[in-house]
From Swiss-Prot:
Substrate binds at D40, R64, G86, R143. It comes from the Bacteria. GO terms for biological process: amino acid biosynthetic process; aromatic amino acid family biosynthetic process; chorismate biosynthetic process. The gene is aroK. The keyword Phosphoprotein does not apply. It comes from Oceanobacillus iheyensis (strain DSM 14371 / CIP 107618 / JCM 11309 / KCTC 3954 / HTE831). InterPro entries: P-loop_NTPase (IPR027417), Shikimate/glucono_kinase (IPR031322), Shikimate_kinase/TSH1 (IPR000623), Shikimate_kinase_CS (IPR023000). ATP binds at G18, V19, G20, K21, T22, T23, R125. This is Shikimate kinase. Belongs to the shikimate kinase family. Monomer.
């Protein structure tokens, strides 16, 4: 897995939109002394506008192509913590890039816990705009099997950001010590 030693491979966080990938990713990056990159923010920088405007003006296809290009570029770098947008991992090419070059953590939040966050998510998530609760649940269910392509799954239900970040950092350190001992 990957062209870099395990200790240097980038860490990629995947999961449904709004599960905390960005917040947890920033915390993990601090704990591991790595740079944090949010793919959606990188796309927004390139287009110089928010994601919802990119979707509206250029369409989802243009957004997804930019997403693939940026992920491909960033996953070839070492020592990063990367947060993918909720829909990024739906692209087979992105799955292959990430699985072959990085360590992937799937942040799994149950539907019931995710529903509690809907109010906070609606404005900033173009994919949710105009959807009923039933349609959102279907989207959640449809994407869940895709996220099963990972190296490690983390159940985030009822866990604080710090707890999840500690778990990820400690499990990585353990894996590094087992598979690449320093002495």
């Amino acid at each position: 897995m990957g062209k870099f030693p395990l200790r240097e491979q980038s860490i990629v966080l995947i999961g449904f939109m709004g599960v905390g990938k960005t917040t947890i990713g920033k915390t993990v990056a601090k704990k591991l002394y790595r740079d944090f990159i949010d793919i959606d923010e990188e796309i927004e920088k390139r287009f110089k506008m928010p994601t919802k405007d990119i979707f509206r003006l250029y369409g989802e296809k243009t957004f997804r192509n930019a997403e693939k290009d940026i992920i491909s570029e960033i996953c070839q770098q070492r020592l990063k913590v990367v947060s993918l947008g909720g829909g990024a991992f739906l692209q087979k090419e992105i799955q292959e890039i990430c699985l072959n070059s990085s360590i992937i953590f799937y942040l799994d939040l149950s539907w019931d816990r995710w529903k509690d966050r809907i109010e906070l998510l609606m404005e900033s998530r173009p994919v949710l705009q105009g959807k009923t609760m039933k349609e959102m649940k279907q989207l959640y269910e449809d994407r869940k099997p895709i996220y099963e392509q990972h190296h490690s799954r983390v159940d985030t239900d009822y866990h604080e950001i710090e707890e999840v970040a500690d778990y990820i950092a400690e499990s990585l350190k353990l894996a590094w010590d087992i598979y690449e001992p320093t002495s």
